[in-house]
Amino acid sequence: MKYNLLPLILLSLLVAPLLAMGSAPAITVTTQPVYHPGQTVFISGVTSPNTLVGITIYNPQGKAVYSNTTTSGPNGDYSLKAFTFPLQESTTFPFGTYTVQVGTQTGFTNSTTFQFLPLTATVNVLVVNPQGVPIQGATVTADSVTATTNASGQAVLNLPTGTYTLKVVPPSPYSPASENITVTAPNTYSFKITVQIQELALQVVSATSPNVNLKDLTSGTSITMIGGTTLTLMSMVTFAGQPISTATVTAMYNGTMYNATYMNGYYVITISVPNTQYETDLVIQATYSGMQSNTVTLPLTVNVNEQAIIASLNSTIQSLESQISSLSSTVSTLSSSVTSLSNTVSSLSSTVSKLNGTVASLQSSVSTLSSEYSTLNSRVNALSGLSGTVDIALAVSIIAIIISIVVLILVFRKIS
């Protein structure tokens, strides 16, 4: 019988370091939590006395940027001056989190991390109203660094050396304010910004559509809706903190100006958006007695409503089918009318043919009567030559009248 000794060999190799570690002391590693450009990194810790310690430092991308060894002292302490960060971040030394890994020849390891960040100045900002009362909830921004004031009206920004525009956007009814500042790291600065009451203030209370239901919108709030639907905006306008009902509220959308209607305490704007894919800004503003309110800009994204397109196409198809059915019925009716007219024409042709035969017969009868009349007339003339009496003439006249009556009767009978 053959035995596979490989698992036993691997097990012995794994157990041996563990047995050694059971009697060996651990190793610690420390460094300061944050470094800035131009600062030197120091690593220190404790392990067993006179022990060789390996140290490796990895940048945020996991690439080793430093590796070295040192030996602990008689009491087990070790320290190492690793490297100095450049004055600007680089590909090798980017800003971010660095990892320090240490290990001893006896098999102990440990690790820690530190941050490499720009050297910054501490900027304390105090936001107050004209009476000096702190304003809570104001957004303070310098470039991409943002903070919000607390209940004491204070916000703290950490900014690298440079010149900035400090922007303050307070809650209603206060108007935004800004101030240009210059700071040098690592100094600490304090700024006090006073915000004024917005005499004419516009607040967008809600935005609704079949798939949108947003409340208390501020400038920059994004709206995403489906095309072919209607967006309803409800706003309030206050003057010196009091609601007013006679302001003019407008919304500029896709190059078209929409005017609001005042209803039940709100200015209502209804916008029908086409069923096409596009992005635009919805800009809302109020005017009152020559004053202009704050501007609220709402980025609007419209997505295509494919179901509405399909429904419209189905409706169009049904309408066309109905029209085709109606046209088919009309064609059938016209065909029937043509057939009826054809039968009528055929009947009239037969009648005309019969009338032609009747006329020919009447013409023959008239010709016969005319011949008989000529014969009678000749006889009358002969009689007139023999006697010339009135009685004979009268008799001939009567006979002529009778013949005419007979002819007329025959003609009327033929026609009827």
UniProtKB/Swiss-Prot annotation:
Residues 1-20 form the signal peptide. Pfam families: CarboxypepD_reg. Disulfide bonds: none annotated. The keyword Membrane applies. It is a single-pass membrane protein. The chain crosses the membrane at residues 392-412. One of its GO terms (cellular component) is plasma membrane. Gene3D superfamilies: 1.20.5.340, 2.60.40.1930, Carboxypeptidase-like, regulatory domain (2.60.40.1120). It is found in: Secreted, Cell wall, S-layer; Cell membrane. Belongs to the Sulfolobales SlaB family. This is S-layer protein B. It comes from Metallosphaera sedula (strain ATCC 51363 / DSM 5348 / JCM 9185 / NBRC 15509 / TH2). The gene is slaB.
